[in-house]
A protein has these predicted regions:
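A generic structural motif
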Residues: 43-48, 104-110
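A short glycine-rich beta-strand->turn/loop micro-motif centered on a GG-aromatic cluster
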Residues: 95-103
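Regulatory modules associated with amino-acid/nitrogen control
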Residues: 1-95, 116-131
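Short acidic/polar capping segments at secondary-structure boundaries
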Residues: 29, 103-104, 113-114
């Protein structure tokens, strides 16, 4: 698939903003209530709703993130989708944390930058729905 085809994905794209606020934490082991757990040979990272943190022990925390989920099928052959999204958000001064699963992609943005992120994605042609 050509990189230029991403314009079609932006124009027909849909994204959903979660109502929850998330924390990204570094832990020694997986969190039971986590949205996502990423393990590599150096660390374990959990993405978890802040309301579910409870007495969770962690080695580091970065909170106040909101999740934007791209509610669309993005084929593995698609080139440049995240480059376009991350580039536009970077140009708008929005830092991101991303997670991709087999069929769904998510971008986490700081709460105070959420409105800027939504407007930026809308300028790309996406329709955004807030939960």
């Amino acid at each position: 698939m050509k990189r230029s085809d991403i314009r079609t994905y932006f124009k027909n794209g849909r994204a959903v903003v979660s109502a929850e606020t998330y924390a990204i934490i570094k832990t020694k082991r997986a969190c039971a209530n986590a949205f996502a757990v990423i393990k590599d040979d150096r660390e374990t990272t959990c993405v978890i709703e802040e309301s579910r943190l409870g007495a969770q022990k962690y080695l580091g925390i970065e909170g106040d993130w909101r999740m934007i989920t791209f509610d669309m099928l993005l084929p593995f052959s698609l080139v440049g989708f995240f480059a376009g999204v991350s580039g536009a958000l970077a140009d708008a001064g929005v830092n991101i944390f991303t997670i991709s699963t087999y069929t769904t992609d998510h971008v986490f943005v700081k709460n105070q930058k959420l409105d800027i992120a939504v407007k930026t994605l809308e300028k790309l042609g996406m329709s955004i729905r807030r939960l």
